[in-house]
Amino acid sequence: MNEPKYKRVMLKLSGEALSGEKGFGFDFDFTKEISEQIKKLVDMGIEVGAVVGGGNIWRGRSGSEMDRTTADYMGMLATCINALALQDSLEQLGVNTRVQTAIEMKEIAEPFIRRRAMRHLEKERVVIFASGTGNPYFSTDTAAALRAAEIEADVILLAKKVDGVYDKDPHKYDDAKKYNKLSYIEVLEQGLQVMDSTATSLCMDNDIPILVFGLDEPCNIIKAVTGEEIGTLVSNSK
């Protein structure tokens, strides 16, 4: 196995990733597979922060008849459910894990405190950041970019159900072209589906590379961290 390319990483997992092939709820076997890869990262000496989405439970935009702010807060609570599920999965493997939330709920998690989060990472604890930024109208992608900047992560590992960034939906178009490398500006100008524009701009301003890859292949998280050429790398230099 190659040596780690990064010392501190931010892993962004969509809620759908935790649902596996089900598309809704939890696939505990698949969540365990993700947790086993995270454990290997910790064993390699890599400090791991994670942000989880909530799309396997609730998608704010799907509640089109609801008040947007209320729908977004419901989505934030969904991320907390996912964070606790991932924490439990990791702790069953013996990985020390902390959940920090942007909305205080001290009975189940710590409030987000930057210095405490960084201290946990230095002590080889995985830190899962839940409830997004704590504000409506901001996605969990933006939360991942924000927390990555705050904890001074070397990279955002954007784990998706697609193995990289394409010029169009590869599930719909057989001639979809995959990119190996992109600049932030190209992503923004072409409207490519990586992160939303707020998150992408935040990464660009803070020079945080984004590695987009699929979870469909075993050990892809390990491959991403050890520098194997998988997925699509988005950075300031193409």
Swiss-Prot record:
Single GO molecular function: UMP kinase activity
Ligand binding (UMP): G54, D72, T133, G134, N135, P136, Y137, F138, S139, T140
Known regulation of activity: Allosterically activated by GTP. Inhibited by UTP.
EC number: 2.7.4.22
GO (cellular component) term, any one: cytoplasm
InterPro entries registered for this protein in UniProt: AceGlu_kinase-like_sf, Asp/Glu/Uridylate_kinase, Uridylate_kinase, Uridylate_kinase_bac
Entry's Gene Ontology BP terms: 'de novo' CTP biosynthetic process; UDP biosynthetic process
Catalytic reaction(s) noted: UMP + ATP = UDP + ADP
Coiled coil location: none
Subcellular location, record wording: Cytoplasm
Chain ranges passing through the membrane: none
Pathway(s) per entry: Pyrimidine metabolism; CTP biosynthesis via de novo pathway; UDP from UMP (UMPK route): step 1/1
Top class in the EC scheme: transferase
Subunit text: Homohexamer.
Similarity comment: family membership: Belongs to the UMP kinase family.
PANTHER family: URIDYLATE KINASE, URIDYLATE KINASE PUMPKIN, CHLOROPLASTIC
Designated name of the protein: Uridylate kinase
Organism listed in the record: Clostridium botulinum (strain Hall / ATCC 3502 / NCTC 13319 / Type A)
